[in-house]
Amino acid sequence: MATDIAAIVRHLEAFYPFRDKAVVHVGAGGGQFIAYAAHAKRVVGVDPDPEAVDRLKTAVREAGLQDRFHALQADLMTVTEKVDVVFFEFCLHEIADPAAALRHARTLAPQTVVVDPAPGSKWAWYCGEEEKVVRSWAAVDRDPPALAARFIGKQSFHDYGELAAKIGMLGEPTLTRIAEFRDRTDFEIAMPYRMALLTTG
């Protein structure tokens, strides 16, 4: 499986200047998108999943970013560190109360960057997350973002087994929805996503 992570990171770096910024990075577990941190002042990567945090620590070490990237197993709502920007990495829709998460982010930083699947995303539909995505963007759009952009990413798979290994554990309706790929090989699923910059004051 390949997500075009390098392209997403390029879009992220063009969308928001992380250089010399102190960052709280929400949903950082796994460390897939940490390349932007090479130019940041310091980053606290937050994820509640201990296994994801272990993967994040490994990614940080392999990228040589230990001097500026600290991995923290925690819920965002318990974080109190003041920074320049809070960055939600494809996770706002997974938070039970996205509006509350955004309110808490505003107590930590004057700016918030949200990257999340776009409403209408086929990938979100296969994952059974379309309602979550709509809810999270409704919370973001409650106050018009200072800056917004939309991109089309992709998820690439060699076969159905690879797809099922990635999202089959979500159960229904995902298993029924991805059944159309059972006999297909080397296919892609579009993953449109949005970026938004929220500011306080």
Regions found by a protein language model. Give the residues of each.
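Conserved alpha-helix/loop element of class I SAM-dependent methyltransferases that forms part
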Residues: 2-21, 32
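Conserved Class I S-adenosyl-L-methionine
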Residues: 30, 135, 141-201
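Conserved SAM-binding loop
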Residues: 56-57
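Conserved SAM/SAH-binding beta-strand->alpha-helix loop
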Residues: 49-51
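A short SAM/SAH-binding and catalytic strip from SAM-dependent methyltransferases
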Residues: 85-98
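Conserved class I S-adenosyl-L-methionine
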Residues: 113-140
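Conserved SAM-binding loop of SAM-dependent methyltransferases across substrates and taxa
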Residues: 30-40
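A short glycine-rich, Lys/Arg-flanked "PGG" loop and its adjoining helix->strand segment in the class I
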Residues: 99-112
